[in-house]
């Protein structure tokens, strides 16, 4: 398949790499050369790690790289796409603008997928003239190693689109779980309030950062504590997702005060080297 990934950030780079390894032709699109260069470097780092671990033979890596096109040319990249995966910032208005633009640029038969973690697929589909071709494919970070993809069907998404999107995900060696088009879907609907309450435990002085994380590492056998996980996801992503959930589900999803403050200070977790932990 000819895949286009819109956005070369953490998620877009991972989706691009995984699609290349699966044998697809991939164009990754950014709006700024600096962001595009950063994305290319992330993709290159994935290949380097794969080679170092013996996961990918060098010949396969070079062949996969030959199928990558990195570009600032949105319309040109989308012209012959079979499937487009949007992976831009988690903001409904931003994504709607991208989908309206995709609708004009991509072939009429192309599937338009969003990597949104919480935003209504029906809403995004309404920004296009082909809502039956719009579907949610929520990948998890880091994409190359995480085996799950949530598939979200909008109110007008066709069964043919769902089937084709599922087949694409399966070529990546990942498992599909289906979710109704409800804000937050499965994972984030449950995960984000868990992280938010853990931050409130810290805000209220119930326990220390280290002990909160240790409690879930040892008491619930989690691989990562909730505060460390928030840093890994990105505090800006956690905050934006909670705001979307709050808009639809009410005050129980209101972001913790310290989370709002940290994001306003540019403390975004691992991506900015500062969050609940320093990196």
Where are these regions (language model features)?
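Rossmann-fold dinucleotide-binding core
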Residues: 111-180, 185-189
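A general alpha-helix detector
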Residues: 46, 147-148, 194-198, 225, ...
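Rossmann-like dinucleotide-binding cores of NAD(P)H-dependent redox enzymes
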Residues: 28-62, 153-162, 176, 183-191
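Rossmann-like NAD(P)-binding element
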Residues: 34-35, 51, 55-111, 119
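Hydrophobic/aromatic beta-strand patches that form the interior of the parallel beta-sheet core
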Residues: 27, 69-71, 85, 135, ...
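NAD(P)-dependent Rossmann-like dehydrogenase/reductase catalytic/cofactor-binding core
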Residues: 8, 22-27, 159-163, 170-181, ...
């Amino acid at each position: 398949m000819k895949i286009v990934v819109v956005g070369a950030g953490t998620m877009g780079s991972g989706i691009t790499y995984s699609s290349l390894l699966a044998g697809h032709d991939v164009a990754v699109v950014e709006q700024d050369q600096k962001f595009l260069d950063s994305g290319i470097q992330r993709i290159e780092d994935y290949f380097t790690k794969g080679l170092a671990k013996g996961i990918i033979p060098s010949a396969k890596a070079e062949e996969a790289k030959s199928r990558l096109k990195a570009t600032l040319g949105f319309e040109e990249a989308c012209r012959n796409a079979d499937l487009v995966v949007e992976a831009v910032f988690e903001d409904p208005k931003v994504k709607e603008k991208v989908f309206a633009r995709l609708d004009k640029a991509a072939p009429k038969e192309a599937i338009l997928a969003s990597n949104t973690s919480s935003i209504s697929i029906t809403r995004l589909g309404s920004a296009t003239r082909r809502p039956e071709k719009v579907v949610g494919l929520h990948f998890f970070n880091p994409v190359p190693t995480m085996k799950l993809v949530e598939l979200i069907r909008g109110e007008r998404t066709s069964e043919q689109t769902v089937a084709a999107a599922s087949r694409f995900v399966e070529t990546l060696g990942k498992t599909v779980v289906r979710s109704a088009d409800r804000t937050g879907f499965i994972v984030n609907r449950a995960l984000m309030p868990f992280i938010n309450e853990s931050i409130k435990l810290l805000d209220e002085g119930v326990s220390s950062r280290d002990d909160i994380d240790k409690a879930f590492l040892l008491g619930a056998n989690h691989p990562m504590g909730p505060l460390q996980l928030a840093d890994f996801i990105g505090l800006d992503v956690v905050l934006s997702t909670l705001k979307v959930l709050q808009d639809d589900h009410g005050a129980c999803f209101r972001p913790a005060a310290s989370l709002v403050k940290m994001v306003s200070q540019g403390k975004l977790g691992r991506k900015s080297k500062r969050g609940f932990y320093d990196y």
